[in-house]
Amino acid sequence: AADVLVFQEDDERFNIGAGRTRDGKYLVLEAASHITSESWFLAADQPTGQFTLVAAREDDHEYSLDHRNGLFYIRTNDKGRNFRLVTAPVATPGREHWTERIPHRAGVALEDVDLFANFFIAAEREDGLPRLRLWQFAGEGPEASQTQEISFPEPAYNAYSGTNRIFDAKTFRYGYTSLVTPSSVFEFDPATGASKLLKQVEVPGNFDRTLYASERLHSTASDGTQVPVSLVYRKDAFVHGRNPLYVYAYGSYGYALPIGFNSNRLSLLDRGVVLAYAHIRGGGDLGEPWHDAGKMLAKRNTFTDFIACVEHLTTSGYGDPARVAIEGGSAGGLLMGAVTNMRPDLFRAVLSHVPFVDVMNTMLDASLPLTVPEYEEWGNPNEEKYFTYMLSYSPYDNLKAASYPAILVKTSLYDSQVMYWEPAKYVAKLRTLKQDARPLLLVTNMQAGHGGASGRYDYLKEIAFDYAFTLRELGII
């Protein structure tokens, strides 16, 4: 038999996906762009039926849904950027029938809802940190009350929903990690409020977490905004104002920078390097308003936030200002290029992975697969106001005759998201302009894509190369 067309999306800004509610009763189709979504549902026992629309798409409105006892539980940003939770009857799911269950809150982002038969977990983000809050149902209806919050003792961490496939489960699994705690899986029992450790990743080499300290602090941006920074260092190697400093950031697409344990980083920490993670605007670390404040015509906030974080770390004694290395990849590579143009004196070494550095030519070429969908993040340069603004920070277009830090640029031949010629032409132009003798390296992986080497050990070789470059430039080896 011929394939049957179930759904077709003609707007190239949108991607489509299919799933099922946790109770298994409904199939769900979703079409979503960066800022807008639309969902349809169909009873799972009627696969040849017609899908029903929940709420028609409207620019800047995103929503997602799950099902329990004849009601859809819908996470929506219709009343505010940080989302709220509503319910709607399956028979009449339109917005006019939505009933609020958790209101929108200015300082708390509702990132996800894990729905079960007897309770649900609201995954939220407050002051840049994840929160997991338990709501228990009073009965078969939607009435529920928040009864507990899972507590996390460390100042900088990541906590997230685990694999929970059973709708009538009595417990809830979640993941936890921090800058000094390896990735762990816990089981939370709503009846007792206790969490039980089920599994923790083993770290070879006699790892002792008590040797390391993690902190969370805030930097003041140029407009007065407080920008969170998470950091980790080895206690017995820390000397105020003397340590090499390594700062990582991303700051785009509303992506909240995950703070987690990485055994590879021990190679740096044990050599006295202080590692810092800057939660700059453009990311989602403080909810969608944080994203809004670092995209489109506010994108330069991303760069000035990062500069403020580095300056605050060095003036506060967390690093030697003459030995600062920075790292970012993809859109984080755009960040690396922009801040290096703005403040080349601030950094000793720059690691830029698959960097989006030729903003103008890429965003003016609508034939590239990601260009049109990306208008919602960067702006459409075919409009003068966006063209002028994007040109003001595009790394390739703002290279100048000046002294630059040591720079390592890495790209991949089969990268379909940031084409290899972007980093290549960036390096070629910079090589003709730079007024110093510091290294400028372009490394092209001839087999990889956007994520770099994927072999079991190949990616470790790439990390070793990065660290060798960093340690050499910071004067450690």
Feature roles, as predicted:
Residues 4, 24, 30, 34-42, ...:
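Beta-propeller blade termini and top-face loops
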Residues 32, 77, 125, 177:
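Short loop/turn segments immediately following the C-termini of beta-strands
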Residues 153, 175, 188-194, 198-330, ...:
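Cap/lid segment of the alpha/beta-hydrolase catalytic domain
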Residues 277-477:
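Active-site-proximal cap/loop segments of hydrolase catalytic domains
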